[in-house]
Amino acid sequence: MPFILSQFIEASRWLGALVVLAVHTSNLFINIADIMSAPHAPLVYVWWFYAAFELGHQAVLAFFVMSGYLVGGAVLAHLRKNQGFLREYLIHRVSRIYLVVGPAVVFTLVLDSIGRWLFASSGVYEWPLFKGHFSALLFLASFLNLQGIGFDYFGTNGPLWSLACEFWYYVTFPLLLLPFARNYPLALRLLGFALGAGLFLAISTPPSWFKFGYILWAGGAFATLIPRPIIRSRWAALLLYAAVVVIIRLVVRGHLVETHPWVADAADLLGSSLFIIVLLAFRYGPSEGFSLLRFKFHKTLADFSFSLYSIHMPILIFARAAVGSTLGNEWATQLATPQNYALAFSLMGVTIVCGYFFSRVTEAKTGAARRKLRAILDRWSPAPARPVPATQAVPAQQPAPAQRQRIEA
């Protein structure tokens, strides 16, 4: 992968996670319901535009596209090269998801339990949004990555729904394409396809975002097969994408979506397609330029963006319950004051720090987890040895007379 594309993806990951965090923080602590009826400072309008559901949703769509491009694209590359890949693919995907999702579900259980005990008077954990979400069944369902698909999410961690969708894309995509993996026995290929089709149908049956999200994820995967950029200029592709996202943010909302629900889906498809065009522009563009993407902090921030996304909501709800119990629920719902903004931004900072330290015991251990999984699989079924390329014998050269004398001496 070109360095500049890799850096763009890293930047998109942490910026997207930051947008989602801002949206949820604003919803809980900053009430700007009078944004259209009263004058505000310019920065308030900037925040209103930035911390909006529509932008957060576009960030999640970009996550799906990038995941498909990286993970699904790798599957397609292996298929085209007739390479065996299922074993390593399983190791990488299971470790990637469960090393974060498993601890995140436990983290949710612990923090929600403490919050329900300490701040019961706030009533936050009794909101209709969380009614019936603290059962053992939903805890188990979240471990199986079924939240948002066949079951509600566990506790207060609603954002985990998207990770459940991604996990099952990881599982079903290579299975559905296994008939094209000619280096595997035909029986295994057909069995894998049948398993993938069965899983896809079973997961698609309950009403969820799984099927529509699959279109976006697979679009990212198959975009890796496009041999040239659709828009050659990276700036032109970026500006077009940004302009459309701005229009979506301002137009695709409220009454329009209620009256014409299909508009939201069309906007999602358009935004995701344009993001793919941006990826291709960076993939096939020149290596120079875009100095802002060359800083190392993009990778540093991206390395814990997954963890931040996975645990931010329980932290924010815990803080909201604490505020409700100490300052009163009316404080968080009043028209925003400087104190509301100060608290919200402080909480965002605390949540980012928590995400970083959480990642140190989860995401940062991915390499070690993969080695352990590989060792376990090797004990059960050793991986076939890679063929050693034949080497042609090279006749030994006779040393020069002077050299021969020194060797023999």
What are the residue ranges of the model-derived segments?
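Hydrophobic alpha-helical transmembrane segments of multipass integral membrane proteins
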Residues: 19, 56, 63-67, 71-72, ...
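Hydrophobic alpha-helical membrane-insertion segments
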Residues: 15-24, 96-118, 302-315
